[in-house]
């Protein structure tokens, strides 16, 4: 006789290896739903050494719903395990909630590996109407768009009460004291964020005598793309190699916001425009520094996310019209420095309550 599952939801993850933004989201979402319904959630760690077939079978059987987030960087070489977990969930008649954070911005090989997950999922949660349309327009996967629901994405990190000193922060502070213009970019560095575009803007600022220092607070995502090599080659081509810093992985929120405090303005020139899935933008806004971003491609991009829309309406996020050339971004950066700081109070728990309720509604 089959016993009732002990948990409402089983969250698949990679344990301490989940250092990417999606991995952090997976952990915080589990915590958020657990706050709504204490004792309702369990986790299953899937890595090269954790998560045997027997472990997966038992864990899947313990919950009514299985929740899986893609893409988690540390799963790139162990993708079979989460897919096996979803297949076992289907065999055991568990409901599968797939949270798909992006689509067209992924390398085509990664999209192919996710096709089985799209097929197995009962519901696909997405955070952006644009990304949902990307899925709908995909010739191989467009059929899965009918399973999609939208949820509001919260920030992964909240500004702490204090900041941490670091050598990099001291370097940035010293640069500002020397009259340099420190332009920031926060988050993982990969092709979908067009990291080289900011280099072009930096070169324009340099030609104008603004003495820019471009700091990328984050690390490169290593994959089949040669994004890091191409980035450094482009910086050298523009004569910007000595004007660019890449921090690498930053371990604590206190250190992240310490670096934020030494930035004059953030800039994100995005081919796809601003979307409601950009949690890195939400982190930057909390610094009170200007955040300059390409405007959204879709007029309804933020209809499902009133908190994000409010940040734009209040001027915390400065939009640049799509199709603008790099000179316009440079102009916005310089002009934004003259505006008063926009300090927006962040109800971190409220943001996470919104997404926890939206996902829990799919159980």
Model feature map: region roles:
Residues 213-229, 249:
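Glycosyltransferase donor-sugar binding loop
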Residues 160-176, 231:
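A short helix/loop element that forms part of the nucleotide-sugar donor recognition site in Leloir-type
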Residues 228-250, 314-319:
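Nucleotide-activated donor-binding/catalytic signature segment of Leloir-type glycosyltransferases, i.e.
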Residues 320-363:
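A charged, aromatic-enriched C-terminal amphipathic alpha-helix characteristic of glycosyltransferases
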Residues 118, 249-250, 257-263:
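Short alpha-helical donor nucleotide-sugar binding micro-motif in glycosyltransferases
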Residues 258-275:
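Acidic donor-binding loop of glycosyltransferase active sites
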Residues 119-167:
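Donor nucleotide-sugar binding/catalytic pocket of nucleotide-sugar-dependent glycosyltransferases
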Residues 175-193, 199-202, 215:
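Conserved donor-binding/catalytic core segment of Leloir-type glycosyltransferases
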């Amino acid at each position: 006789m089959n016993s009732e599952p002990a948990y409402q939801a089983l969250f698949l993850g990679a344990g301490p290896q989940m250092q990417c933004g999606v991995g952090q989201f997976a952990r915080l979402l589990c915590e958020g739903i657990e706050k709504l319904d204490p004792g309702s959630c369990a986790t299953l760690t899937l890595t090269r050494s954790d998560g045997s077939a027997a472990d997966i079978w038992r864990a899947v059987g313990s919950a009514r719903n299985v929740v899986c987030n893609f893409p988690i960087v540390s799963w790139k070489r162990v993708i079979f395990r989460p897919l096996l977990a979803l297949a076992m969930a289907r065999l055991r008649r568990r409901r599968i909630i797939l949270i798909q954070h992006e689509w067209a911005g992924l390398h085509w090989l990664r999209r192919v590996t996710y096709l089985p997950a799209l097929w197995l999922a009962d519901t696909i949660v997405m955070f952006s109407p644009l990304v949902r349309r990307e899925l709908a327009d995909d010739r191989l996967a467009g059929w899965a768009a009918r399973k999609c629901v939208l949820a509001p994405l919260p920030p992964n990190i909240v500004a702490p009460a204090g900041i941490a000193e670091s050598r990099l922060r001291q370097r940035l502070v010293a640069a500002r004291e020397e009259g340099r213009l420190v332009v920031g970019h926060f988050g993982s560095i990969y092709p979908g964020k067009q990291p080289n575009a900011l280099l072009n803007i930096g070169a324009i600022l340099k030609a104008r005598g603004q003495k820019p220092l471009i700091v990328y607070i984050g690390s490169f995502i290593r994959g089949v793309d040669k994004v890091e090599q191409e980035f450094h080659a482009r910086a050298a081509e523009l004569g910007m190699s000595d004007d660019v810093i890449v921090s690498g992985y930053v371990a604590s929120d206190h250190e992240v916001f310490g670096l934020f405090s030494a930035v004059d303005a953030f800039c994100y020139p995005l081919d796809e425009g601003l979307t409601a899935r950009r949690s890195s933008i939400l982190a930057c806004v909390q610094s009170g520094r200007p955040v300059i971003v390409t405007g959204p491609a879709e007029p309804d991009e933020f209809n499902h996310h009133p908190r994000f829309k409010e940040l734009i309406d209040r001027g915390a996020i400065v939009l640049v019209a799509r199709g603008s050339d790099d000179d316009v971004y440079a102009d916005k950066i310089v002009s934004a420095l003259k505006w008063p700081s926009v300090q927006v109070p962040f109800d971190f728990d409220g943001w996470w309550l919104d997404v926890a309720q939206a996902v829990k509604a799919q159980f």
